[in-house]
Swiss-Prot record:
The gene is der. PANTHER family: GTPASE DER. GO terms for molecular function: GTP binding; ribosome binding. CDD domains: EngA1 (cd01894), EngA2 (cd01895). This is GTPase Der. GTP 1 binds at residues 9-16, 56-60, 119-122. Keywords: GTP-binding, Nucleotide-binding, Repeat, Ribosome biogenesis. Residues 364-448 form the KH-like domain. The keyword DNA repair does not apply. Belongs to the TRAFAC class TrmE-Era-EngA-EngB-Septin-like GTPase superfamily. EngA (Der) GTPase family. GTP 2 binds at residues 194-201, 241-245, 306-309. Residues 464-492 are annotated as: Disordered.
Length: 492
C-alpha cells in the first residue's frame, strides 16, 4: 500500500500551491482568499520512482468560533490519523502565529514523522530571517517557495527516504499478453453535481461511511471539486464532490467562478454524473441547466431526488414528481431516476449498483455485424426522406469509440439527414442493442474514395436486395389476387 503524506497548516500558507507543485497538476484551487481549501484532496504522486498519496487539507484553525473552523479542524485531524507522514506548512513571510505554535505542539506529540516546511521564501535575504522558526522546538525545517519550485526537492528526497523498501517488480513472462481492461475491471469515475446545498457532500459521506467532506446548511460549503476513492464488492469508484453550480447572475466571488469551472471540468472527466435534486424545492430551471451540462459532455447520468424523507405524505407523489422531471429533461430521457435521502440512507445502497449498470452500457462496444443489421432493419422499417429528389443511401455503420458509444454512419449526403431521422436511428440502436441507460452519439460521414467492404456488412446492397424481394412479393400477391377475382367472376 502506498504511503500517505498529509499537508497541514493554517489557511493561506500555500498548501494547495505545494500540492499542485508536487503532483504537477492544478487539482487544488489556489487563491489569495483564506480558507479556499475546505476539504481533503487525495492525489497519487511519484518522486524518485517512489509512489505515494498526497493529501491537501483545509486550513487548520484552533478556534471554535466559526462552524467551518470546527469542521475543517476535524478533517485535518482525520487526515493526520490516516497519514503515514505529516508535513506542516508555515508562512515565511508572515512569520509564526499562535496557531502555528499550537499545531506544532500537537504534531510533536504524534509518533509519526513530521516535516516542517517554511513556504514563500524566494531569496537568501529571507532565509536569514527564518531563525525564529527554531523557537517551535524543531531541529530542522525546509525553506522553500512552492510557487516558484525552489527548495521543494530536498524535502521530497528526505521524505521518500522514510518510505518502506519498495516491493520487487514481477516481470511478465515471455509470451504473456496484457490487454486493455474490460468495463468490469475499470475504475468508475463519478461526479456528484447539483445546485448548492442539495446534499452532495452528505451523499459522499454516506457512500464512504465516514466524514470525508465538510457538510453544512450554508450553501456553497464545497468550493472545490474533491476526489475520493472507494471500493465496493471488488470494484473501485472515484467520487468527485463538485462545487455547487449556481446561476451566472448569482456567482459573485472570484473563487466561486473558479470552483464552477472545475465542476464543469469534472463532468468532462467523469463516466457517470449523479445529478442531485432537492425534493423539497422540486425540479428547478437550474437543475435542468446542470443536466444539460452533463448531456453536452456526453457522460452517463443518474438523477437522485434527495431529501425525499423531508416531504410530508401529501407531497410524496413519486409518479407526479417523475413526470415533471421527465417533461423538463426530455434530452436526458435515458437517465434513470431514484428517490433517496443522503441523511437517513434511504435507498442510497442502490446507487453504486445502478452506476455500475450505467457504466457497463456507457463502455459497451456493439458488434459491427449486429450494428449494421440494426441500422438496416431501421431503414427498412422507415425509409429516410428524399434529398433534392434523390434518396439518401446508407452504406455501412461502425462504432468508433466508447464512453459514450459513438457510431459513424457513412451516407451519400450526410448533411441531408434530418434531425428527426437522426433521433429515430438513435432510438432504434438504443432499443435493439439494449443500451437504454447511456448516451449514444451518432455521426454521419460522406463515403469518399474507394471503400473496401471486405469483412463489413454491405448495408446498402442488402437494403436494395430486401426492397427488391419485397417488391417482387407484392407483385406476386397482386397477381394472385387478380387471378382469384377472375375465377370468382367466371363462377358467378
Amino acid at each position: 500500500m502506498k504511503p500517505v503524506v498529509a499537508l497541514v497548516g493554517r489557511p493561506n500558507v500555500g498548501k494547495s500551491t505545494l500540492f499542485n507543485r508536487i503532483t504537477r497538476s492544478r487539482n487544488a484551487l489556489v487563491d489569495d482568499f483564506p480558507g479556499v481549501t475546505r476539504d481533503r484532496h487525495y492525489v497519487d504522486a511519484v518522486w524518485n520512482e517512489r509512489p505515494f498519496t498526497l493529501v491537501d487539507t483545509g486550513g487548520f484553525l484552533l478556534s471554535d468560533d466559526d462552524f467551518f473552523a470546527r469542521e475543517i479542524r476535524g478533517h485535518v485531524e482525520l487526515a493526520i490519523e490516516d497519514a503515514d507522514i505529516v508535513a506542516l506548512v508555515l508562512d515565511g513571510r508572515a512569520g509564526i502565529s499562535p496557531f502555528d505554535r499550537d499545531l506544532a505542539d500537537i504534531l510533536r506529540r504524534t509518533s509519526k514523522p513530521v516535516f516542517f516546511l517554511v513556504n514563500k521564501v524566494e531569496n537568501h535575504k529571507q532565509r536569514e530571517e527564518l531563525l525564529e522558526f527554531y523557537s517551535l522546538g524543531i531541529e530542522k525545517f525546509y525553506p522553500m517557495s512552492a510557487e516558484h519550485g525552489i527548495g521543494v526537492e530536498p524535502f521530497l528526497d528526505d521524505m521518500v527516504a522514510l518510505f518502506p523498501a519498495p516491493e520487487p517488480v514481477v516481470e511478465p513472462q515471455a509470451g504473456s499478453e496484457q490487454g486493455e481492461p474490460d468495463a468490469s475491471e475499470q475504475e468508475i469515475c463519478i461526479a456528484v453535481a447539483g445546485r448548492p446545498n442539495v446534499g452532495k457532500s452528505s451523499l459522499i459521506n454516506r457512500l464512504f461511511g465516514k466524514s470525508r467532506v465538510v457538510v453544512s446548511h450554508v450553501p456553497g460549503t464545497t468550493r472545490d471539486s474533491v476526489d475520493l476513492s472507494i471500493e465496493r464488492n471488488g470494484r473501485r469508484f472515484r467520487l468527485i464532490d463538485t462545487a455547487g453550480i449556481r446561476r451566472k447572475g448569482k456567482v459573485r466571488e472570484r473563487i466561486e467562478k473558479y470552483s464552477i469551472l472545475k465542476s464543469l471540468k469534472s463532468l468532462d472527466q467523469c463516466d457517470v454524473a449523479l445529478i442531485l435534486i432537492d425534493a423539497d424545492e422540486g425540479v428547478t430551471d437550474q437543475d435542468i441547466t446542470i443536466a444539460g451540462y452533463a448531456q453536452d459532455r456526453g457522460c452517463g447520468a443518474l438523477f437522485l431526488i434527495n431529501k425525499w424523507d423531508l416531504l410530508d405524505e401529501d407531497r410524496k407523489d413519486q409518479r407526479r414528481f417523475m413526470e415533471d422531471l421527465r417533461t423538463k429533461s426530455k434530452f436526458l430521457s435515458f437517465a434513470p431516476a431514484m428517490t433517496i435521502s443522503a441523511l437517513t440512507g434511504f435507498r442510497t445502497h442502490k446507487i453504486l449498483a445502478m452506476v455500475e449498470k450505467i457504466h457497463a452500457q456507457y463502455a459497451y462496444r456493439i458488434n459491427t455485424g449486429l450494428l449494421n443489421r440494426i441500422v438496416e432493419d431501421a431503414i427498412f422499417r422507415s425509409e429516410p426522406p428524399m434529398h433534392k429528389g434523390k434518396r439518401l443511401k446508407f452504406f455501412y455503420a461502425t462504432q468508433v469509440a466508447v464512453k459514450p458509444p459513438t457510431i459513424v454512419c457513412f451516407v451519400n449526403y450526410p448533411d441531408a439527414v434530418h434531425f428527426s431521422y437522426h433521433r429515430y436511428l438513435v432510438n432504434q440502436i438504443r432499443e435493439m442493442a439494449e443500451l437504454e441507460h447511456t448516451p449514444i452519439r451518432l455521426l454521419f460521414r460522406a463515403k469518399t474514395g474507394k471503400i473496401d467492404f471486405s469483412g463489413k456488412s454491405k448495408l446498402a446492397e442488402r437494403i436494395v436486395e430486401k426492397k427488391e424481394k419485397k417488391t417482387t412479393r407484392r407483385k406476386k400477391e397482386r397477381k394472385e389476387q387478380s387471378r382469384r377475382k377472375r375465377v370468382r367472376d367466371l363462377k358467378g
